């Protein structure tokens, strides 16, 4: 599966596209059929909060160290294998997905490389406490709230600011 655009991701998971460059995806609300094992080639940035067990990730033959209440992140050019381990339950995951062009001419775009957790060399997820999960979800809620409003002159600035806030919490 190739995810080069937000539309491709949203189509794959069966959710509406509210903005062409950014999406907040709740996997448990997805309308897509669950596939037991597949590869994802990212052309966008993706930050996943996994709240439950039920799937494994790997880069090539290297397993990704993550479990419940963990954050995983991917940058354009990365490929990951997803394996659903329990077909009876859809994993509870929330993702923030954004196209690299969305960051053009922003401070975050100029500094995105400082967030080393996007790197292939990092195969460990960020493990969160209950309180940290709450903060993570609050920031995603703010982004989602902005996505549910019509796009205006402030949309991009507000969303980019919240993306940066979320990334800073992950440092």
Can you say where each PLM-predicted feature lies in the sequence?
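Conserved hydrophobic/aromatic beta-strand scaffold that supports enzyme active sites
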Residues: 24, 47, 71-73, 95-97, ...
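An amphipathic alpha-helical interaction segment
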Residues: 134-171
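A hydrophobic/aromatic-rich effector-binding and dimerization subdomain
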Residues: 83-148
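Short acidic-glycine-tyrosine-enriched beta hairpin
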Residues: 61-75
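Histidine-centered metal-chelating micro-motifs
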Residues: 54, 72, 77-83, 103-104
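Generic protein-terminus/edge-of-domain signal
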Residues: 1-58, 62-65
């Amino acid at each position: 599966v190739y995810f080069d655009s937000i539309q491709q991701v949203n189509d794959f998971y069966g959710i509406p596209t509210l903005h062409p460059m950014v999406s907040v995806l709740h996997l448990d609300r997805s309308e897509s059929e669950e596939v037991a094992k597949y590869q994802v080639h990212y052309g966008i940035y993706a930050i996943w909060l996994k709240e439950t067990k039920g799937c494994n990730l790997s880069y090539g033959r290297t397993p990704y160290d993550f479990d419940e209440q963990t954050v995983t992140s991917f940058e354009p050019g990365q490929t990951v294998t997803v394996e659903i381990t329990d077909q009876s339950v859809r994993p509870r995951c929330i993702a923030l997905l954004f196209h690299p062009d969305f960051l053009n001419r922003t401070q975050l775009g100029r500094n995105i490389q400082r967030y080393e957790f996007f790197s292939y060399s990092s195969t460990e997820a960020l493990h969160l406490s209950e309180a940290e999960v709450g903060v993570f979800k609050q920031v995603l809620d703010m982004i989602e709230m902005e996505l549910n409003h019509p796009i205006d002159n402030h949309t991009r600035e507000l969303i980019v600011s919240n993306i940066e806030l979320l990334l800073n919490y992950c440092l």
